[in-house]
Amino acid sequence: MKNLVGRFMRYVTFDTQSKPKNHHCPSSTGQKVFAQALYEELLELGLSDVSLDDHGYVMAKLPSNVNYPVPAIGFIAHMDTSPDACGKHVKPQIVEDYQGGDIALGKGDEVLSPIQYPDLHLLHGYNLITTDGTTLLGADNKAGIAEIITAMEILLADPSIPHGDISIAFTPDEEIGRGANHFDVAKFAAQWAYTIDGGPIGELEYENFNAATATVVCHGVNVHPGTAKDKMVNAMHIAAQFILMMPENETPQHTEGYQGFYHLSGATMSVAKSELKYILRDFEAIGLQARQALMQAKVAELNQQLKKGRVEVSFEQSYSNMKEKVEPHPHIIELAKQAMVACDVEPKIKPIRGGTDGARLSFMGLPCPNIFTGGYNFHGIHEFITIEGMEAAVQVIVKLAEKTALHYRQ
């Protein structure tokens, strides 16, 4: 456990932001550099079958230390950080024994405030790792990587802890939805796995959104503005009309829990052509279909108003709710709950308002729920993590390996 914080602090200095416009895998050079460093670290640690493939996937195994059959289990985390905030020159700072109030982030005016982030009220006495206010932290998901490797280090050092075969993997490009694209499930050779990619202590998740991307294209007519009367059709105005037709109360800032949403995530605007990017999310497959149908209806309505087919919409499916693939295997969740309780961690089962590699892997034959890292406020400059949460995640991984082995001894 003594290497955990230092390991994490070292990992976050790697610039591993994924790049959605680059369709190579991995999408950024920094991920290749980080993958190589992890590969070398796992070799040095003494794990077996350590590999780094051409797509940047790092895998390794810890062989069983018991003399009876135990299903192989896996632990997975991702190497990339979100493109939503700067991930270069990350300078983490440790706040020891937090006692409340605003936390100054670096030398500027940026603060981490309990007024804006009430979770801080629950963390008095904890040791926090924050950003310096200029970048994200990268706890999502370098904390998961540090926790998995530290857990393997503990198991290697203490053969008295029984465990079956354990596979670990670190994936590229999860943040841009491609983390499972080249994942070799057969090579990984686990019966089930857990992503270590959740938030606060105790999170255990096996439900996630059904997800799709919608592209709305508005076609206009560009004419010199000096002679544009009755000729110009401004595609940006059409796009604005469409935006206002969408239900405002079903956007991310107005939804929570099991509520789905429409999220306008980007736009490219010009008079001649404007393009809107939406992400659609719903926990029910039929609900996602209904959201797509509503957008198609709004496009038809707007085209009728314009008296011409100037607007079109297309959809791309992203991932599905893993619930249907995990629920038939209740022992996967039960063992995780038992491991948490044994570590004095209260399991908090909740839906993931997003997706993980585990969602797609579950549909590739590898049921894969999600476990906490101890982090908060991912994807932005106010991201932070508690050292206690990281330590708890390590303890849960170790205990989960042990509980699985003991379960199959009976």
Swiss-Prot record:
- Write down the superkingdom of origin: Bacteria
Q: Write down any Gene Ontology CC term.
A: cytosol
Positions of Zn(2+) 1 binding: H78, D140, D197
* Signal peptide stretch: none
**Which biological processes are named by the entry's GO terms?**
peptide catabolic process; proteolysis
InterPro entries, sorted: ArgE/DapE_CS (IPR001261), Bact_exopeptidase_dim_dom (IPR036264), Peptidase_M20 (IPR002933), Peptidase_M20_dimer (IPR011650), Peptidase_M20B (IPR010161)
- Catalytic positions are D80, E174 (proton acceptor)
Reactions performed catalytically: Release of the N-terminal residue from a tripeptide
Needed co-factor(s):
Zn(2+)
Free-text comment on the cofactor: Binds 2 Zn(2+) ions per subunit.
Q: For this protein, what is the EC number?
A: 3.4.11.4
Q: Which GO terms describe its molecular function?
A: metallopeptidase activity; tripeptide aminopeptidase activity; zinc ion binding
Instruction: State the compartments where it is located.
Output: Cytoplasm
Which residues does the record give as Zn(2+) 2 binding sites?
D140, E175, H379
A Pfam family annotated for this chain is M20_dimer
Enumerate the UniProt keywords alphabetically.
Aminopeptidase, Cytoplasm, Hydrolase, Metal-binding, Metalloprotease, Protease, Zinc
Q: What is its main location?
A: cytoplasm
In terms of NCBIfam families, this protein maps to: peptidase-T (TIGR01882), PRK05469.1 (NF003976), PRK13381.1 (NF009920)
Under the heading PANTHER family, the entry gives: PEPTIDASE T
What this protein is reported to do is described as:
Cleaves the N-terminal amino acid of tripeptides.
Similarity comment text for this entry: Belongs to the peptidase M20B family.
What name does this protein carry?
Answer: Peptidase T
Which species does this protein come from?
Vibrio cholerae serotype O1 (strain ATCC 39315 / El Tor Inaba N16961)
